[in-house]
Amino acid sequence: MKWHDQAPEGKLDLLMTIDFRQTSTTIFSDVVLPAATWYEKHDLNTTDMHPFVHSFNPAIAPPWQTRTDWDAWQTIAAKFSELAAEHLGVRRDVVAVPLTHDTPDAMANPHGVVRDWKAGECDLVPGVTMPRIVEVERDYGAVAEKMNALGPLTDTLGATTKGVTFELGAQVDYLRAKNGAVRGGVADGRPSLKRDVHVCEAILALSGTTNGQLAVQGFRTLERRTGTRLTDLAEEHEGKQITFADTQGPPVPVITSPEWSGSETGGRRYSPFTINVERLKPWHTLTGRMHFYLDHDWMTELGEGLPVYRPPLNMAALFAEPVIGNVSAGAAHGQVAGVTVRYLTPHSKWSIHSEYQDNLFMLSLSRGGQNIWMSDKDAEKVGIKDNDWIEAVNRNGVVVARAIVSHRMPEGTVYMYHAQDRLIDVPIAETSGKRGGIHNSLTRLLVKPSHLIGGYAQLTYAFNYLGPTGNQRDEVTVIRRRSQDVEY
C-alpha cells in the first residue's frame, strides 16, 4: 500500500465489499472481505412470489478467512463502537424524512395541487409542504450492543407494514425465551440477536407470513377498517408459528398475511391482488380502486394524466450523440467506420443477475466473455463479422466485446445482456487505452421528473417500494470493428 499525502477527491472515499466471488464491484473496491456461501452459513430465503420459506444451512464451517455476513458485520460493529465511543460519543442529528406511503402523509397534497413555498404560494410546513423533520439520537459507542438485540420500540410501537400495525408484545416475550436475554449494557433484558440463528428466529416470529397469530391479528385490523371479512384467510393457521428448525426440514408453506395482496388459503398458489379482487379490500390508491387517471399537477403538465406512449429520448438533440443509423468514419482510428445504434441492456437469460455468468460451461457455449448482439444489416454496414472484436463508444464510456451477428436482431438496435462482469476476457480498449467496461459503462441514470412526486395517495414514497428509479436502459452508441489483435 502506497501512502499519498495529497489524496484524490471524489464522490466516494472508501468502497468495501463482502462477497464470495470476484465481481465487477470487487474490482473497484478498496477492501474486499471474503464471505461464506450458501452451504457455510445459516440464513433464510423467500420472497412474496414464492410459496415456501427456505433455510440455508452450513455443510461445513466457513473455510480459510471467510465469515458469514452476520459475523463480518458484528466484527466491524464491535470495532467501530470501540473507536466511536471515544471519538463520536452520543450525537443528535436532524433528519429529513420523506412523506411516506400508507400513512397520513399520503394526503399531504389534496387534489394533487403542488404549491411552491419558495414563491410564497404556501407556508413551509414540515410533513405537508416539505419532508418531516425528525431528531435522531445516535449512540455511536453502542452500535454493536444495539445490533445484537431486538430494540425496545417493538414493544411500544409494534411494526407497521402496508399501513397495518402489528402489536408484538407476545412475540417479543417468545423471542426472549427462545434466544435468551441480553445481560448488561444498553440492551439489558432485550431478546438476543447475537447469532445468525437468533436473527432468523426473529424474522420468522415477527412476520405474519410465518406467524399465524400475527396474520390473523393483521386481518382483524383490516376488517375493522374495511368492513369486509378477511380473518378466515389465515384462521386455519392461527396457532402455527414457523421456527428456523421447521425450515431445515422439508419446504414450509407460508401463511396468507395482510403484508401481501395474494391468498394461499387452502393450498392455492399465490397470485397478486387476489384479496383485493375477491374480498373487496381497497387498493392502496386515491380512490381505493384500480384506476388509470392521475390528476396530479405534474402528471397533467407532462401530458401523462392518462397512460400514453412516449418515444425514446432523442439523445442526438439532448446530448449531441450521432443520429441512429448514421454511418461515419472514426477519425481517431483511420477510416474504420462506425454505425450508430440504439443500445439496450435486457435482463440476462443465462445467469441469475450476475451469478453464474462466469460458469465455464455457459462461457464455452457462448463467446467466452462479454458480447453484444447486433443485426446482420448493421454489421454489414461497417464490415463486422460474427465473433469479431468490436468497440461500443458513447459519451458515457467504452465497451470491448465480441459481436454476435444475428438476423433475429432488428436493424438499428443492439443488445448487451446485463450482468456480464468485467473480469473475463476484457481487453484494453483502443479508444481509451484502458480496460473495456461493462454493460452499464455506456449508460447513465436519468431520473424521470414524475417519479419525484410525493405526498399524494399511491404516488407517495416508500423505500424499495415506490420512488425514483434509474431509467438507464435506453441509450445510443457507435459500434465499430476494432483491431483483432487485442491486448490485455
Descriptions of predicted regions:
Residues 1-27:
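Glycine-rich phosphate-binding loop of nucleotide-binding enzymes
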Residues 17-19, 35, 346, 374:
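Short His-Asn-centered micro-motif
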Residues 24-56:
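Flexible glycine/proline-rich, aromatic-decorated loop/lid segments
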Residues 35, 287, 294, 345-347, ...:
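Pocket-edge structural micro-motifs
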Residues 46, 58-70, 372:
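Hydrophobic alpha-helical scaffolding
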Residues 71-130, 187, 202-213, 217-233, ...:
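Long, contiguous, secondary-structure-rich segments that constitute the structural scaffold
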Residues 107-359:
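Long, low-complexity segments enriched in small/aliphatic residues
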